[in-house]
Each structure stands twice: as C-alpha cells, then as structure tokens.
C-alpha cells in the first residue's frame, strides 16, 4: 500500500481508503470482518458520514483494540431523526448526533471532524459565526477532533472553503463522469435518474479542474467520494461514455488529480477490497 500526506493534516493516509456507506447492507459480523480485512491490506482511513446506529456500531466494533490503525472522518451535521438521515445545522440535533458518533465508535476522539455536505454558497455563508461552526472549533480546541475538513460536491463552494483557511482537507466527489458535468448539477438527482449529457459537452469542467489545483496550492488534501459514481461507470448501459470502465481506471483517474491523497471506495466483499488494493501493484 502506498501512503500520501493528507494536506495540512499531516496524516499519512492509504491511497485506497474505505467508504463506510455499504456496511449496513450486511450482517454485523460480516461487515466487522470486512473492515478488519481492509485494515490488514493496509487501508487506514474511513469515512463515517452515516448517522444510522448500525453503521456506527459496526465501525466501533471493528476498530476496537486497534483504534490507532484508523483515521476516521466523522461528520458534524449528519443526524438520525425518526429512523431517517437528516442533514442539519440545528444544534439540538447536531451535538447529540456527534456525541453518539463518539459513543458508538467507542472512541474519545475523531481524527478529522467534517463539516457535513456544504453544497451552496448560501449554506457556506450561513456557517460563518454560527453556533454550528463554534461547536466544531470548540471540539478542535478541546482535542476531541484533531483536524477540520468539509464534504462537498460543488467546486465553487469548495473553493471558498479552501481559500478561507478553515479546512485542512476536503471530501469531494471525483470521477471521470462528474468532472465533465456543468457546475450546479444536482449529483444526488443524477445518481437517482442517470446521466444526461449535452452532446456538445467535451472535456473536464474547468471549475472542477481549477479546484484540484487550488487544493494542491493551498495544501488542502482531498479524499475522494463517489469515485465509481455508485457503480454506474461499470455498466455500459448506465455509463455516459457508452462503455464500462473498470475500478482500476476510476481509481487511477481519482488518484492522479492534483491534491488527491486517497479514494474512499465502498466494499461489499473481501474480493472487492482485493480488487481495489490491486491498483497499488498494477503496471501503468
């Protein structure tokens, strides 16, 4: 496994990371074993945006006894309300949800405290001088979180955050298809309904390309989410390119963008872990 410095955090993270979103699909013992298997393969960074109790419990149990082997991205503002995920800045939900994260992960610290899902300039502006941001900064000062990051799908908002000096790293959606989309595209809607490209569109979205360079310039490390576009790029009928890409191609694309330190892949099986980790030994 190769490791890269994650921007200003100084953390040496594995190029192949772990996106925890799919853990709740499977029986708890299988998911715990899968996460431990990934650790044995050298994977040392996991994103836990998920607020549901099952996912958090799995991660906590999998890390028990080897917490120091994992860097955790834990999110402020991802909450579980009435059995549903709700993104919010309301402190009556934010604080208990973060405390729940610590409890279920069986840890007294989170390596990277993530400002969750900031996709509009309005949302970014509203964070300034907010109780939400004060809470994040307070957790940093108290050592409960060691670093501050942010997750976003929008290059304009991300650029504002990078230039602000607030964040040390960015969780951003990077894949060959998303990088050709016009800015402002609703990626959640796109993943639900499929890709619809203007036939005249060609080449990378310059705002996204500029963001990667900006992150490199400001030493804000990038970890990659949605590197496979939810698996759609592996299906020629759902891929906007008309051909199926391979995991290896998507991983290579993400890891060769400026500023990128790690791609956080979702896994259902040990074989999928092996397939992703095999990138490290693949020839150019």
What positions do the PLM features span?
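Acidic (Asp/Glu)-rich catalytic clusters
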Residues: 7-10, 40, 60-71, 102-108, ...
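Beta/alpha (TIM)-barrel catalytic core signal, keyed to glycine-rich beta->alpha loops juxtaposed to Asp/Glu
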Residues: 118-284
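Active-site groove signature of glycoside hydrolases
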Residues: 100-124
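Acidic-and-aromatic substrate-binding clefts and catalytic sites of carbohydrate-active enzymes
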Residues: 23-29, 47-57, 81, 89, ...
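N-terminal binding-site loop/beta-alpha segment at the start of enzyme catalytic domains
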Residues: 1-74, 141
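Conserved, mostly hydrophobic/aromatic
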Residues: 6, 18, 46, 59, ...
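Active-site mouth loops of central-metabolism enzymes
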Residues: 19-29, 79-95, 121-125, 234-244
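Short, acidic/polar
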Residues: 25-38, 89-106, 152-160, 245-253
């Amino acid at each position: 496994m190769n490791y890269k410095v994650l921007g200003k955090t100084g953390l040496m993270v594995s190029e192949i990371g772990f996106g925890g979103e799919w853990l709740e699909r499977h029986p708890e013992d299988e998911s715990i074993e899968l996460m431990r298997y990934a650790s044995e393969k050298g994977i040392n960074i996991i994103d836990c945006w998920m607020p549901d109790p099952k996912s958090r419990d799995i991660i906590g149990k999998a890390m028990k006894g080897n917490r120091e082997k994992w860097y955790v991205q834990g999110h402020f503002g991802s909450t579980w309300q009435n059995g549903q995920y709700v993104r919010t800045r309301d402190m009556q939900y934010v604080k208990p949800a973060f405390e729940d994260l610590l409890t279920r992960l069986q840890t007294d610290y989170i390596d990277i405290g993530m400002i969750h899902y900031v996709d509009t300039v309005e949302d970014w502006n509203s964070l300034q001088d907010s109780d939400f941001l004060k809470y994040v900064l307070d957790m940093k000062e108290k050592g409960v979180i060691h670093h501050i990051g942010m997750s976003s799908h929008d290059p304009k908002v991300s650029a504002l955050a990078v230039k602000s000096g607030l964040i040390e790293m960015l969780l951003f959606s990077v894949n060959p298809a998303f990088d050709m989309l016009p800015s402002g595209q609703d990626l959640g809607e796109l993943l639900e309904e499929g890709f619809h490209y203007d036939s005249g569109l060609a080449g990378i979205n310059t705002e996204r390309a500029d963001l990667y360079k900006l992150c490199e310039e400001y030493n804000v490390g990038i970890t990659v989410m949605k590197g496979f576009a939810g698996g759609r790029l592996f299906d020629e009928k759902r891929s906007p390119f008309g051909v199926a890409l391979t995991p290896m191609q998507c991983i290579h694309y993400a890891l060769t963008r400026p500023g990128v330190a790690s791609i956080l892949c979702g896994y259902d099986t040990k074989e999928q872990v092996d397939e992703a980790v095999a990138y490290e030994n693949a020839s150019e």
